[in-house]
Structure formats: C-alpha cells, structure tokens
A protein has these predicted regions:
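Extended, helix-rich architectural segments
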Residues: 1-211, 216-225
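Extended, charged amphipathic alpha-helical segments
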Residues: 211, 219-259
C-alpha cells in the first residue's frame, strides 16, 4: 500500500487491534497463569502503575515452571547461549575446487556475526522471545544500533502489537502502541519532527509520557516498507522512514489457516 496519512494509519491500527481482541480472553488466561511476570493484560498494561503484584490468581506454579522449561530447552537446543549455533557453508553453485577457500571466508564471517550478536545481547532477547512463543506468538524488533550495541534486538510484548496478514498467511504489516517520555523522543528517534504545538503541550513536564502508534507496512509497488510513528490521536506524523527490509521477526507456535 502507498504511504498512509496519520489518521488513516490510526484507522488501520484500530482495525487490526479490534481483530486481535477476538483472542483477548485466551491471552489473558495464558499470561495470568503461565507467564504472569510478563502479563500486560488484565489492565496492567494500561494502568500506568508498574511494579504491581501479578501473582494474585496463581496458586500453583506448574504452568509457570513448564513455560520456563519450554523456553530454556528450546533455547539450549536451537540457540545455545555463548555458542556458535550455526555455520555458513558454500552453496551448490560454488565449484568443488573452491569449497575450501570459500568455507574459510564464510567461517570468518560467521565468527564476526556471532561476536556482533553477543555484543548486542541477542541471547537475553531470545530468552524473552521464547517465553512469549510459549503463549503462542513471539515478536522481536531488529534495528541498527551503535558502537556499543551494534544491533538492537528488542522483544516486544504481544499486548502492544497487532498484525495484518499478507499472501499465504504471512504477517505483512505490524502496528504497535507504545509510550515514551517526551524528553527521550529526540534521543531515540533522531529523525523525529515535533511540531511546536506538541512541544508546548509538554513544556511544563518533559518527563510526561507520550502515547504513540508505530506502523510498519508493505508497499507492493516498490517492494519496500513504510515505517511511521504518529501521535495517538492520529493528527501528527512524527517519524517516517522508507525501509528496504522488514525489521520484525514474528513467530507463531501454532497457526490455524484462515483464522
């Protein structure tokens, strides 16, 4: 789809979120009993009161322990921390006489790749990601970092995210509702454009939280992805980027076709 106006992006988010709400009661039960430490349902995500006791309805730890074992076993079996869990190898199109030379080059790339991933705290983010996957859906945002953290792996709670599917049931568009203190917006998003009216609104208390809607959606005409951040009202566009690749990793443990 072409680039959306802020109010149209708000409508797309509302529509996708309404569709997600059909599974809300299932998510509430799953997080309440199996993953209470990451539960943002039951009003925890909207109450703006962090640090609440989320264990009031938990009288048996079987589900919690089973969820943690599932995530730990999956991580140790597929993505073992502090280990090189995959190897880049020459493809079939590489001549046999060049296999040794190419493999040596690819091993150097693999070594560098894992060094960057460890420096970027991939193992920690993957642990959170697999806990979310135990509930059914896991979401990770992968963004460029800086010299200290070259890649930013951010596991996003499913409470904050809603999707639209493209062809073949693949997640194609992702919308997220998030909050940030006003005074960190320009640090986190260097290309943000804040209107004077918005600056005036938060001039008395720059630590006040700002409600934002983020959209990442596919443009089939260009093959790129539009990335936008707007204010919750859908009036102002704060950030726009034209992305060559999809920054989201979406994993669903079990997906029923056509649902």
């Amino acid at each position: 789809m072409p680039k959306l106006k802020p109010n149209d992006l708000k409508k797309r988010y509302d529509s996708a979120n309404s569709h997600k709400d059909q599974w809300r009661s299932i998510y509430e039960d799953a997080y309440r009993y199996a993953l209470p430490m990451r539960n943002l349902y039951d009003g925890y995500g909207t109450a703006n009161v962090p640090g609440q006791n989320k264990m009031n309805d938990v009288f048996d730890s079987t589900a919690i322990q089973s969820t943690q074992k599932f995530a730990n076993r999956l991580q140790s079996g597929v993505f073992p921390p502090q280990r090189d869990w995959c190897r880049l190898m020459p493809g079939d199109e590489i001549p046999d006489e060049r296999n040794v030379e190419v493999q040596r080059i690819l091993d150097d790339y693999s070594k560098k790749m894992f060094a960057v991933m460890r420096q970027s705290q991939f193992d920690m983010s993957m642990g959170e990601f697999l806990l979310e996957l135990a509930v059914g859906t896991a979401v990770m945002l992968v963004q460029p970092g800086d010299e200290v953290q070259p890649i930013r792996y951010t596991c996003i709670p499913t409470f904050s995210v809603c999707f639209e599917e493209g062809p073949f049931g693949k997640v194609q568009n992702v919308y997220r509702k998030m909050k940030r203190p006003f005074n960190v917006l320009e640090q986190e998003f260097p290309d943000i454009k804040i209107s004077q009216a918005m600056r005036s609104r938060y001039s008395n208390d720059e630590t006040e939280m700002v409600d934002l809607i983020e959209g990442t959606y596919y443009d089939k005409l260009t093959g790129n992805y539009h990335y936008q951040i707007i204010d919750e009202s859908g009036q102002d566009e704060l950030v726009y980027r034209d992305l060559k690749s999809f920054p989201w990793i979406i994993a669903r443990f079990l997906k029923l076709s056509s649902e």
